[in-house]
Amino acid sequence: MARYAAGAVDCPGSPKSVRIVVVGDKGTGKSSLIVAAATDSFPPNVPPVLPDYKLPIEFFPDGIPVTIVDTSSRPEDRDIVAEELKRADAVVLTYACDRPETLERLSEYWLPELRRLEVKIPIIVAGCKLDFRDDNNQVSLEQVMSPIMQQFREIETCIECSALKQLQAQEVFYYAQKTVLHPTGPLFDQDSQALKPRCVRALKRIFILCDHDRDGALSEAELNDFQVKCFHAPLQPSEIEGVKRVVQEKLPEGVNERGLTVTGFLFLHALFIEKGRLETTWTVLRKFGYNNDIRLAEELLPSAIFKRAPDQSFELTNAAIDFLKGMYMLFDDDQDNNLRPQEIEDLFSTAPESPWKEAPYEDAAEKTALGGLSFDAFLSMWSLMTLLEPARSVENLIYIGFPGDPSTAIRVTRRRRLDRKKQQCERKVFQCFVFGPNNAGKSALLNCFLGRSYTDNQESTTDERYAVNMVDESGAKKTLIMREIPEDGVQGLFSSKESLAACDIAVFVYDSSDESSWKRATQLLVEVANYGEATGYEVPCLMVSAKDDLDSSPISIQESTRMTQDMGIEPPVSISSKLGDFNNLFRKILTAAQHPHLSIPETEAGKSRKHYNRLINRSLMAVSIGAAAVVVGLAAYRVYATRKSSSA
């Protein structure tokens, strides 16, 4: 199980090339080191800065193209060096063994400078000119570098070399390349001396994929299948027994009567890494499609399936929904239609992290009394992620075990523009933009949509927020996504021509007891309607008269009714979040969204534009009819003339 397969670098996620940038003080031997490593000889004369040097593919056993970039030490070239560092995969930082001040400059200038530039890549420290070091100053490399490496954890390794004596010059770049192909950082925490969480999650997923009979242990046959997949050679029975014995001696629960448990599997990889055999763990990860970030490589998520027009969206397919239903039942241990937070964490334990722990997903769905998710809420969360981040949704479906082709997990909907023309919609997921002035009741509306109790101390939000839930409509459940747009976020929304393309319906909430709130909501309605007319992404709209439990402004009632009639949309829907009276609002929103040709407001500018277009069309029609009459007249005249000529 510890054999290394060089072919692993050909797997998805493997770096396809390595770019190494060499930096350090003037006169520390940067250029000489590069030439000595590349040509196996010492150069008597080298230019101040070498051109980029490409090593042959066969130079190192991994067969990865390596480019070495020399840099200038002149202060005026710092910007150029900084740009090269930002493009690098690894850094070789040099000092001269015969000049102690260049060693001091590593921690005084170079390493802090790399941090300032946010160069988050492996660093190899190379002590050059080893042959020039004073024989009376034979301090060990470990003694010199240990304090620096404790302070700067980004240093992967240190090595002393001599270009003149051809001593370890090539090894400097071999180690640099190795830190790119098999970095320690993503796998192992040096402080805690333990595997990092993301590495544990990836290895757990690999274990589950290899545990074909799902009995929680890798049998001898399953271990051999794993070995052949990763290392192209089976294990001998004695080797399998040796692996089990090593694990059992250190971790008894790592082996049971059925084979190697997941705990034992993780222990083995921690052991490989502690012994410096990172290539073993990286080979396994690469074979299962992981990149250096311990995420699935982009090649495994074909970008073609995520192409769409701005007014199209993505939804889960029936195959994905059936799979998610099965996963929900599997992790809902007591089958009480309540997936508890820990059960959700267990579900995503084979993903790099739980995708729902941060905005916009955190608190976006209705919770049960125990803080969990019902199946409807669980599926709603997946629908929200599929609409907002389809690639992330598919990626997480793969992490939790979706068995089919990723392209069968989601489907692209018909264009909304075409829905309006056909006057019908086949969508199952609808997005509603919620506009309104501050303190109008938008946040309270979203909270109540999620079944949460009303509170008088509801704080206004300055950030966009999502709420998602299922709504029953004519005996069928549809998913409604409410997107709250803060008042000061409206202009930012309009910075993109396609900002309304993803909107199925817009609602405008105002405080019915505050005349200024109604006026501002009306302004927002006109702004959105104007923008929709100008960009071609017109959307159905509804006005929502909130806080109906308070005394309504008489002017607001009269004017809002007149205004909605003038614009050709439904009268405002009165609601009270405090009293829990929503007047079937969410069903009305869904109904309007499913009839995209109705409830579209017309502004005065829009009416004028349509009137103008009708006049133009009539004029063109008149011209066409007149032209047709002329053509018919000419044809009749020619027939008449021909007959007259014949009779003569």
Curated annotation (Swiss-Prot):
Subcellular location: Mitochondrion outer membrane
GO terms assigned for molecular function: calcium ion binding; GTP binding; GTPase activity
Binding site for Ca(2+) 1: 211, 213, 215, 222
Effect of loss of the gene: Embryonic lethality between the apical 2-cell and the 4-terminal-cell embryo stage. Impaired in pollen germination and pollen tube growth.
Membrane disposition: Single-pass type IV membrane protein
GO cellular-component term (any): plastid
Phylogenetic placement of the source organism: Eukaryota, Viridiplantae, Streptophyta, Embryophyta, Tracheophyta
Family per similarity comment: Belongs to the mitochondrial Rho GTPase family.
Organism of this sequence: Arabidopsis thaliana
InterPro entries xref list: EF-hand-dom_pair, EF_Hand_1_Ca_BS, EF_hand_assoc_1, EF_hand_assoc_2, Miro, Miro-EF-hand_domain, MIRO_dom, P-loop_NTPase
Gene behind the chain: MIRO1
Function: Mitochondrial GTPase required to maintain proper development, morphology and intracellular distribution of mitochondria, which in turn are essential for the progress of embryonic cell division, development of haploid male and female gametes, and pollen tube growth.
Protein name, entry field: Mitochondrial Rho GTPase 1
Topology Mitochondrial intermembrane: residue spans: 641-648
